[in-house]
């Protein structure tokens, strides 16, 4: 905890020095003490009745902050308070309470939310329906709750979150919702059909490929890739000429999925257009075309030769994509080209070679993976191990050897696999479990805990050993690991030990300063080799996240790091010092889930699980409603949006600076 306190103070210091003193006037904050205590409770993940009762006596703004805080504290005592705030005189408070109840995931809140769904304030009703979707309510019960409202009002409250109800009955509702004249409601109806599609929605999805809204065309194409058939390829083909990149990218992915799934053959009439898209000036389109082209590589000499040439002559990111595409398509030159890439000087390309080798399978790919397993880069070793374990279900000895790797990420991957596969007893794995969790690299530790719990379910003879390990993990160690171990014990029907506060090292004075520094939005520039992206940081909605981001930026933490994840028409992600999605600053911060939405240009905190954020952030390239209420939104791109579409995998972040 001392280390975390020092880290926080350093971050505050970095924020203070990133601008002159005159740039940071003291902000007068009403009810500063109460707001600071609420932030302290969120950070400690604890409920305090005295603080709650004091906040309830405050004005509407303070009561709204209370509702937000209670939604971020996993304590059922907060549910009763929030249900009372659902009938507050102020609409802003009722909205915050409705959203917060959805975040608490307590099914007993459903009764109060059904009533709130028909609140006089539409937004409160929308948020109540969203919360009911998160809590697993039946859509028929939501409809019954909305019956007293006019029909247009019912649609306005139901459609934005209809996709959250995982029932086949939503298909008919969404199809009716498509008739709404409000373009946004029409789009949300289409999203509900597309996000987790049911096969019976196929006829409607096919029609939506010609919708006037490019978002709808893209969503429909994606859905057809999941539930469509080979008969859908002719309907997808026109989207290769779509004027918007979203539908084009999703049609390429859908075709690749249908072919890879054995539902279709690679159509010859796509070849010429696909070949042209391999040289498209838009990086996202080009990347998607390269990925899809693997499905044509073996049957089309033109496509196969183009991909083979790209592995040698393209930019590094293109070479890696082409290499994996050739391996996935079983092209005859793939093994030779993968072996060459395995000896490349570029770490990212060697990691891609490991992925390709895994797709080649054994024994050909195994020879390449054997060499990469001893690579100097932990990133390459981790990729080689993951590929090897995926290709060979009998790779127990490989995993055991990896437990001795000096890198925690490699050890974590091995431990996760060994815990899931009964080739080693849990008693044998216990020493490795103790050392797998490292702050800032929590994904491996969380995966190991879940794998141990899964072993308890699948191997009755080891249930006792698994429970003992989980009890040990729940009793000590980092908060997120203790919480996960306790949750897994509960699922196994075992007593869940009391959860000690997450953060004990910071006093109220630290939180007062954070509240004062984050009472207003701040602005930063993310300077990249492709141009500058200007982001307004929504500090009032996510103060801990914003102060952390500003502190890291002020220290120069982001200087020279890369965008290690680029998914066209979805997100770009950066901020990992390891460059592979497993790294962080050496600590984690609390989630601050809020009501800001993941439209294009939203900036969110990347996670490996609840409360595991640190330095990695992502920016959405298109609207992503399914991310709403699941990841902290802490910023919005306000200038330089065109740069987002030019970012390539591996592009560098030159610097992140705060600007006026």
Q: Which residues does each predicted region cover?
A:
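Cyclophilin-like peptidyl-prolyl cis-trans isomerases
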Residues: 15-17, 407, 424-427, 431-660
């Amino acid at each position: 905890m001392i280390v975390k306190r020092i880290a926080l103070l350093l971050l505050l210091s970095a924020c203070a020095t990133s601008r002159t003193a005159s740039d940071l006037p003291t902000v007068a904050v009403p009810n500063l003490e109460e707001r600071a205590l609420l932030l302290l409770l969120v950070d400690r993940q604890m409920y305090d009745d005295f603080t709650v009762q004091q906040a309830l006596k405050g004005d509407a703004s303070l009561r709204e902050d209370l509702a937000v805080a209670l939604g971020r504290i996993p304590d059922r005592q907060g549910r009763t308070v929030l249900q009372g705030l659902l009938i507050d005189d102020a609409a802003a408070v009722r909205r915050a309470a409705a959203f917060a109840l959805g975040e608490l995931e307590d099914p007993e809140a459903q009764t109060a939310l059904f009533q709130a769904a028909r609140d006089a304030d539409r937004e409160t009703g929308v948020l109540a329906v969203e919360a009911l979707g998160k809590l697993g309510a039946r859509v028929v019960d939501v409809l019954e709750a909305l019956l007293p409202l006019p029909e247009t009002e019912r649609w306005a409250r139901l459609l934005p979150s209809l996709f959250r109800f995982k029932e086949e009955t939503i298909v008919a509702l969404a199809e009716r919702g498509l008739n709404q004249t409000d373009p946004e409601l029409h789009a949300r109806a289409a999203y509900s059909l597309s996000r987790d599609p049911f096969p019976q929605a196929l006829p409607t999805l096919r029609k939506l490929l010609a919708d006037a809204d490019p978002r709808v065309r893209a969503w429909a194409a994606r859905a057809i890739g999941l539930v469509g058939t080979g008969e859908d390829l002719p309907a997808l083909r026109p989207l290769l000429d779509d004027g918007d990149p979203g539908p084009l990218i999703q049609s390429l992915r859908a075709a690749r999925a249908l072919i890879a799934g054995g539902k279709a053959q690679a159509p010859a009439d796509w070849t010429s257009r696909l070949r042209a898209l391999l040289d498209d000036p838009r990086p996202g389109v080009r990347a998607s075309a390269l990925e899809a082209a693997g499905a044509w590589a073996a049957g089309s000499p033109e496509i196969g030769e183009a991909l083979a040439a790209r592995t040698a002559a393209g930019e590094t990111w293109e070479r890696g994509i082409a290499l994996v595409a050739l391996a996935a398509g079983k092209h005859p030159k793939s093994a030779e080209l993968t072996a060459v890439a395995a000896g490349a000087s570029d770490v990212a390309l060697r990691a891609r070679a490991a992925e390709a080798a895994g797709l080649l399978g054994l024994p050909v790919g195994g020879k390449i993976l054997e060499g990469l397993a001893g690579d100097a880069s932990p990133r390459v070793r981790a990729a080689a191990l993951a590929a090897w374990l995926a290709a060979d279900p009998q790779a127990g000895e490989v995993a055991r050897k990896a437990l001795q790797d000096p890198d925690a990420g490699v050890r974590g991957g091995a431990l996760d696999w060994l815990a899931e596969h009964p080739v080693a007893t849990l008693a044998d794995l216990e020493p490795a479990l103790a050392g797998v969790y490292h702050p800032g690299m929590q994904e491996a530790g969380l995966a190991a805990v879940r794998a141990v719990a899964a072993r308890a379910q699948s191997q009755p003879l080891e249930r006792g050993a698994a429970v003992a390990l989980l009890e040990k993990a729940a009793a000590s160690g980092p908060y997120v690991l203790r919480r996960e171990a306790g949750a897994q014990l509960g699922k196994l029907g075992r007593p869940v030990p009391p959860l000690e506060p997450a953060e004990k090292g910071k006093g109220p004075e630290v939180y007062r300063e954070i509240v004062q520094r984050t009472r207003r939005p701040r602005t930063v520039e993310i300077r990249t080799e492709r141009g500058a992206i200007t982001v307004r940081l929504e500090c009032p909605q996510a103060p801990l996240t914003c102060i952390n981001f500003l502190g890291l930026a002020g220290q120069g933490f982001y200087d020279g790091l890369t965008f290690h994840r680029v998914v066209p028409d979805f997100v770009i992600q950066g901020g990992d010092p390891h460059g592979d999605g497993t790294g962080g600053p050496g600590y984690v911060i609390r989630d601050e889930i809020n009501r800001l939405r993941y439209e294009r240009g939203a900036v969110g905190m990347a996670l490996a699980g609840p409360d595991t954020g640190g330095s990695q952030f992502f920016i959405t390239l298109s609207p992503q409603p399914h991310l709403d209420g699941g990841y902290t939104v802490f910023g919005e791109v306000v200038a330089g949006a065109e740069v987002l579409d030019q970012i390539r995998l591996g592009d560098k972040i030159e610097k992140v600076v705060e600007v006026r």
